[in-house]
């Protein structure tokens, strides 16, 4: 088991780890269930957060509460795990066997010791018995790595889609975790989890003064200017706030357009820490030039700021206008992976086309990135060669 960080009271309340009441799963489906599952993609929501933040509490709440949602929950545990894991995971011949159990409120649950990919593949055999999938990561995991598997596994992608990333932050210890300095300039895990989130739950707000919650909220906003922040106690949250987010698909186009107009730029809360920058550039970009701009940032990693530090982009989101396309295009990026997808929203003939981008990362320089994007739209090669250092690739 991975060692806990901090004092013992950071850990989850043992009572909250108890296994929910289980009933045997039915192996047959009704015709209605089978029909409802055919041809429909299932949304997957990633639940992440530092050790003791309240991930298990949230999942136990979902698994036991009466909420009319049919949710499949995949618990990702390391080492000995909790009573919940011991009840759900069976090891045979040294290999893990996933046992899916149906709970009294209609939800499904299993526990795995790997990245959850195999569990999801097995779960799809029960398609029609659930409407949503929640995938928990370990406390020290980088959710970006888990996110990427939904983009690179084409076969799996035919059945599911990534709906969003939920990060839970402990009110009592969150500020300590987010400001912890790592050796060699590495980004600490808690900060990276917040940077990638679409929804941030500040949990256990009843355990600290209101002033401490405000400080934590300010720090979170300084890291991620795009995600929605919610305050909770004992991880109790309206499921409508964490499900059906459509944070990674074209259905978010309309709401994203409004949201990007109000995303604040942020200042780092520590030297060389993660910030959010946003800018708007009018015009149309050729798709090949847009790809080159993104690939230099995410793949080649050869873009540097005024201090000659490498820019590291953790999350990229935006709406762009591509030449010869009548639809607005949403761009999404997580670490090295990115995607361009047309939205249902068309550009109006009487309005100027524009591009709005939000980037979350480290050592980001808004002026340089905006200049590079202007060069992308106007096809000005000089601006590109000034800041793309092909012989000085960042590692």
Swiss-Prot record:
Q: Which GO terms describe its cellular component?
A: cytoplasm; nucleus
The record ties this protein, via Pfam families, to: cobW (PF02492), CobW_C (PF07683)
Pinpoint motif CXCC motif by residue range. Answer: 107-110
Q: Tell me the segments the record calls region Disordered.
A: 1-22
Q: Which GO terms describe its molecular function?
A: GTP binding; GTPase activity; metal ion binding; zinc chaperone activity
* GO biological process assignments: protein maturation
Keywords of this entry: Chaperone, GTP-binding, Hydrolase, Metal-binding, Nucleotide-binding, Nucleus, Zinc
**SUPFAM superfamilies per record:** Hypothetical protein YjiA, C-terminal domain (SSF90002), P-loop containing nucleoside triphosphate hydrolases (SSF52540)
Fetch the Gene3D superfamilies from UniProt: CobW-like, C-terminal domain, P-loop containing nucleotide triphosphate hydrolases
Where do we find the motif psi-PxLVp motif here? Answer: 17-24
Which EC number(s) are documented for this chain? Answer: 3.6.5.-
State where GTP binds: 49-56, 110-114, 203-206
Name the chemical reaction catalysed here.
Answer: GTP + H2O = GDP + phosphate + H(+)
Instruction: Kindly report, in one word, the top-level EC class recorded for this enzyme.
Output: hydrolase
Acidic residues bias spans: 8-20
Q: Which domain of life is it from?
A: Eukaryota
Q: Which family does it belong to?
A: Belongs to the SIMIBI class G3E GTPase family. ZNG1 subfamily.
Its function, per the record, reads: Zinc chaperone that directly transfers zinc cofactor to target metalloproteins, thereby activating them. Catalyzes zinc insertion into the active site of methionine aminopeptidase METAP1, which function to cleave the initiator methionine from polypeptides during or after protein translation. Mechanistically, the N-terminal psi-PxLVp motif binds to the C6H2-type zinc finger of inactive form of METAP1.
Q: What is this protein called?
A: Zinc-regulated GTPase metalloprotein activator 1E
Q: Which gene encodes it?
A: ZNG1E
């Amino acid at each position: 088991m991975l060692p806990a960080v901090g004092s013992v009271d950071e850990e989850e309340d043992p009572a909250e780890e108890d296994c929910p009441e289980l009933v045997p799963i039915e192996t047959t489906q009704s015709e209605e269930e089978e029909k409802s599952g055919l041809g429909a993609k299932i949304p997957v929501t990633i639940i992440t957060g530092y050790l003791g933040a309240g991930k298990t509490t949230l999942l136990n709440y979902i698994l036991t509460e009466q909420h009319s949602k049919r949710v499949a929950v995949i618990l990702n545990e390391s080492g000995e795990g909790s009573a919940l894991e011991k009840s759900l995971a069976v090891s045979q011949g040294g290999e893990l066997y996933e046992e899916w159990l149906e709970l009294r409120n209609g939800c499904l649950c299993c526990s795995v010791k790997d990245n959850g990919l195999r569990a999801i593949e097995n779960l799809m055999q029960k398609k029609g018995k659930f409407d949503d999938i929640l995938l928990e990561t370990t406390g020290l995991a980088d959710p970006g790595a888990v996110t990427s598997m939904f983009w690179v596994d084409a076969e799996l992608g035919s059945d599911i889609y990534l709906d969003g990333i939920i990060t839970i932050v402990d009110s009592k210890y969150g500020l300590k975790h987010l400001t912890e300095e790592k050796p060699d300039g590495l980004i600490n895990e808690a900060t990276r989890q917040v940077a990638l989130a679409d929804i941030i739950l500040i949990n256990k707000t009843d355990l600290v003064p209101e002033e401490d919650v405000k400080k934590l909220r300010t720090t979170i906003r300084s890291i991620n200017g795009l995600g929605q922040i919610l305050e909770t106690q004992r991880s109790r949250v309206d499921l409508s706030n964490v499900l059906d987010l459509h944070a990674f698909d074209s259905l978010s186009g309309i709401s994203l357009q409004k949201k990007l107009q109000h995303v604040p730029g942020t200042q780092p809360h520590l030297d060389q820490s993660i910030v959010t920058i946003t800018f708007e550039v009018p015009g149309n970009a050729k798709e090949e030039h847009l790809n080159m701009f993104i690939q230099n940032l995410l793949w080649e990693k050869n873009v540097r700021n005024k201090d000659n530090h490498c820019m590291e982009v953790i999350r990229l989101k935006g709406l762009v206008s591509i030449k010869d396309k009548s639809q607005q295009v949403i761009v999404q990026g997580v670490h090295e992976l990115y995607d361009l997808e047309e939205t249902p929203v068309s550009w109006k003939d009487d309005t100027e086309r524009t591009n709005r981008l939000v980037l979350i990362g480290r050592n980001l320089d808004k002026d340089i990135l905006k200049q590079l994007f202007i060069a992308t739209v106007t096809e000005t090669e000089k601006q590109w060669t000034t800041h793309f250092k092909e012989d000085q690739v960042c590692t």
